[in-house]
């Protein structure tokens, strides 16, 4: 299965009539492996900050997390595994696997829980595959 298929069929899938605004699978260096049409372009320093937060949980909390210059307030996550952010009526979930970052961005009416489920389910699957 191609990386684009994972994005199209597993991240951008419909959940209770809703779907993510955008999604992607990136390498730990920020290289895009696959993405949805509207996925924002991360800046290198944003990826650096995200990876540092995985290594040092809480690193982004004081400043917020920036994604394509949009600022997200960092909310509860799983140290070293998941970063969650909130921005207005939407938010972001990033799941770290051995080689990748699985990213989902949502807006209402999709809920944070639905975004978390979609992103973390694929991330957990990739971890089980050694990826």
Swiss-Prot record:
GO CC, one annotated term: cell cortex
Post-translational modification comment from the UniProt entry: Phosphorylated by MAP kinases.
Residues carrying Phosphothreonine: 111
Disulfide partners: 13-115
GO MF annotations in UniProt: actin monomer binding
PROSITE patterns: PROFILIN
Source organism superkingdom: Eukaryota
Calcium in keyword set: no
Main localization (coarse): cytoplasm
Gene3D superfamilies xrefs: Dynein light chain 2a, cytoplasmic
Motif window: Involved in PIP2 interaction: 81-97
UniProt cross-references to SMART domains, sorted A to Z: PROF (SM00392)
Record's keyword terms, sorted: Actin-binding, Allergen, Cytoplasm, Cytoskeleton, Disulfide bond, Phosphoprotein
Localization: Cytoplasm, Cytoskeleton
Subunit-level organization: Occurs in many kinds of cells as a complex with monomeric actin in a 1:1 ratio.
Note: The variability of the residues taking part of IgE-binding epitopes might be responsible of the difference in cross-reactivity among olive pollen cultivars, and between distantly related pollen species, leading to a variable range of allergy reactions among atopic patients.
Function description: Binds to actin and affects the structure of the cytoskeleton. At high concentrations, profilin prevents the polymerization of actin, whereas it enhances it at low concentrations.
Similarity remark: Belongs to the profilin family.
UniProt protein name: Profilin-7
């Amino acid at each position: 299965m191609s990386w684009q298929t994972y994005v199209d069929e597993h991240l951008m899938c419909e959940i209770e009539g809703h779907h993510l605004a955008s999604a992607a699978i990136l390498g730990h260096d920020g290289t895009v492996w696959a993405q949805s049409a509207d996925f924002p372009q991360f800046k290198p320093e944003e990826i650096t900050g995200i990876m540092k937060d995985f290594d040092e949980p809480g690193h982004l909390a004081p400043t917020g997390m920036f994604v394509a210059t949009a600022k997200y307030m960092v909310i509860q996550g799983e140290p070293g595994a998941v970063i969650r952010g909130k921005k207005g009526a939407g938010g972001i979930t990033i799941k770290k696997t051995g080689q990748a970052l699985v990213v989902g961005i949502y807006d209402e009416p999709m809920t944070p829980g639905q975004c978390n489920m979609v992103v973390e389910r694929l991330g957990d699957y990739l971890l089980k595959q050694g990826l």
